[in-house]
Amino acid sequence: MGIRKYKPTTPGRRGSSVADFVEVTRSTPEKSLVRPLHSKGGRNNAGRVTVRHQGGGHKRAYRVIDFRRHDKDGVPAKVAHIEYDPNRTARIALLHYADGEKRYILAPRNLQQGDRVENGPGADIKPGNNLALRNIPVGTTIHAIELRPGGGAKFARSAGASVQLLAKEGTMAHLRMPSGEIRLVDQRCRATVGEVGNAEQSNINWGKAGRKRWLGVRPTVRGVVMNPVDHPHGGGEGRTSGGRHPVSPWGKKEGRTRSPKKASNKYIVRRRKTNKKR
């Protein structure tokens, strides 16, 4: 993937850039793997906003991605197409299995049209192949990793994401996450070799607010510029938060929200580096 920069023909175009899509080989998705997707606009079943800054955007169709590839062990597949997916930052690859079935997977870096992909313990260690962690050599770069055996891929699924297999100890594997966190995962969990493609996605300059609106992202307004009726930080002459610590629009203290008693904390060997907020 490369990035194409626009000429500054308008203020919105100045500095903006877009992916060149050279790796995409087909513009229309596989009909049997497409489902309707209804935009929620950040609302729940009661119609109340539960996630702010969402709404609008272009209509999308959901592509069904295979995050559980257990049932295709020993069945080889050929990469028919690399496609664009509007619902994620990564590209997706359409696989044609030898038994006639078609499925989508996340497209790893350097996976090309016509390549062969395999699943199971007998698969080679090359990008796109899916194996259990116990069958992957230490030091290998992997992505789309399960948290629990058979639970489907949960980690490292966005563009450019990758995890390194550091060690194996007993029944657990030590993984270095994209955040720098080192975590224990059961060796029976599956992972895909390689890193997710489209790594240049993070370098795209959107250029104007309208391009974010096309993606369904609404403006983020700071509480300090609101009125007192709208936010605890609102009001006052000039920029002032009233001398209180940062809070949400509902008055709840801002900061870290993870519970110190969470059961899965015992699987974290080393935490990611963060700028701690008091």
Curated annotation (Swiss-Prot):
A single GO cellular-component term on record: large ribosomal subunit
Record keyword RNA-binding present: yes
Coiled-coil regions, chain positions: none
GO aspect biological process, one term: translation
Sequence ranges of Basic residues compositional bias: 258-278
Superkingdom of origin organism: Bacteria
Transmembrane segments: none
Molecular function terms, GO-annotated: RNA binding; rRNA binding; structural constituent of ribosome; transferase activity
Region feature (Disordered): 26-57, 225-278
Key words of the record: Ribonucleoprotein, Ribosomal protein, RNA-binding, rRNA-binding
Pfam families associated with the record: Ribosomal_L2 (PF00181), Ribosomal_L2_C (PF03947)
Task of the protein: One of the primary rRNA binding proteins. Required for association of the 30S and 50S subunits to form the 70S ribosome, for tRNA binding and peptide bond formation. It has been suggested to have peptidyltransferase activity; this is somewhat controversial. Makes several contacts with the 16S rRNA in the 70S ribosome.
Family statement: Belongs to the universal ribosomal protein uL2 family.
Assembly and binders: Part of the 50S ribosomal subunit. Forms a bridge to the 30S subunit in the 70S ribosome.
Protein name: Large ribosomal subunit protein uL2
Native organism: Streptomyces coelicolor (strain ATCC BAA-471 / A3(2) / M145)
Lineage: Bacteria, Bacillati, Actinomycetota, Actinomycetes, Kitasatosporales
